[in-house]
């Protein structure tokens, strides 16, 4: 019997078919397993807090972020303060930021930090942080206006700026993020009541929808307060296991492993997912603008 060898010209075609099938299957699996709809025209971003340790857990969270990006192509990461612990020399910026997030940085994902109490003021001049020399600043993506604040030094000048910037914003969504949480039920730090008294009335007056903070090394979603949805996500590097003290304010919490958040905003909906260092979904839901999480 005479057997002919396969036509080599078919190999590229077969390879394309196999890769396309794998991509479709992977996308289908993501759609089935993820609470995020992954719509083509939505705003997608990640949130990390208290991440800059340079230790193995930080790198493992970063690896989960990279895996997520392959299916959920976010192009923004908001950083909730304590972006770097300990010494903050050039070598530390390499080990505690550039190396763990290299796969994301290399494809153009933009990191936008807020300062925490462990961060040196000089961080505002570090080019990959995109702060442009400002302790607090605002920027817009799609129909969302972000406000990155410096809660460590909340002086009168910043408070006046917050009110002016919120008043002038015209986007549908207003999201504020900063380090010290206005609401937290973690034992170590808890709620920053003085800060809440100072800035929450401004948030309410001008219709802030969502607030992200860190500082407590846990994940917590707070029941909506005065129409605002609050998240604490301070465990992307540091962790305090067993530190949560749940109360009636706590909608969901997780303190058994490091974690980060993935967020998608589409129209009047904000979908969110809290993901552990091992890739486990520890909380998820959707917020309707001017409504409550469900």
Where are the regions that the model predicts?
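A short C-terminal boundary segment appended to hydrolase-like catalytic domains
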Residues: 39, 253-294
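N-terminal active-site segment of His-dependent metallophosphoesterases
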Residues: 27-92, 157, 185
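Extended active-site neighborhood of metal-dependent phosphoesterases/phosphodiesterases
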Residues: 37-39, 44, 66, 85-174, ...
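N-terminal secretory signal peptides that target proteins for export/translocation
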Residues: 1-8
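Generic beta-sheet signal
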Residues: 75-77, 172-178
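Active-site glycine-centered loops adjacent to acidic/histidine catalytic or metal-binding residues
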Residues: 50, 81-82, 116-117, 179, ...
């Amino acid at each position: 019997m005479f057997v002919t060898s396969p036509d080599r010209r078919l190999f590229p075609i077969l390879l394309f078919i196999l890769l396309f099938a794998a991509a479709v299957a992977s996308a289908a699996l993501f759609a089935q397993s993820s609470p995020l709809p992954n719509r083509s025209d939505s705003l997608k971003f990640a949130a990390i807090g208290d991440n800059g340790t340079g230790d193995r857990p930080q790198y493992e969270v970063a690896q989960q972020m990279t895996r997520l990006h392959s299916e959920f192509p976010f192009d923004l990461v908001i950083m909730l303060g304590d972006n770097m612990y300990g010494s903050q020399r050039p070598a530390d910026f390499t080990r505690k930021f550039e190396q763990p997030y290299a796969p994301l940085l290399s494809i153009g994902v933009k990191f936008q930090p807020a300062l925490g109490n462990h961060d040196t003021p000089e961080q505002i001049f570090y080019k990959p942080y995109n702060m442009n020399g400002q302790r607090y600043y605002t920027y817009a993506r799609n129909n969302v206006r972000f406000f990155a604040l410096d809660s460590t030094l909340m002086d009168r000048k910043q408070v006046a700026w917050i009110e002016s910037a919120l008043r002038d914003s015209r986007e549908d969504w207003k999201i504020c993020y900063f380090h010290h949480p206005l609401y937290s039920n973690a034992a170590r730090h808890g709620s920053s009541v003085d800060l809440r008294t100072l800035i929450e009335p401004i948030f309410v007056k001008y219709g802030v929808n969502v607030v992200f903070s860190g500082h407590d090394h846990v994940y917590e979603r707070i029941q909506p307060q005065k129409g605002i949805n609050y998240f604490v996500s301070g465990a992307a590097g540091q962790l305090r296991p067993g530190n949560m003290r749940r109360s009636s304010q706590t909608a969901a919490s997780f303190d058994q492993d490091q974690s980060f958040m993935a967020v998608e905003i589409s129209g009047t909906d904000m979908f969110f997912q809290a993901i552990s260092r091992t890739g486990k979904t520890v909380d998820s839901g959707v917020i309707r603008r001017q409504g409550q999480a469900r």
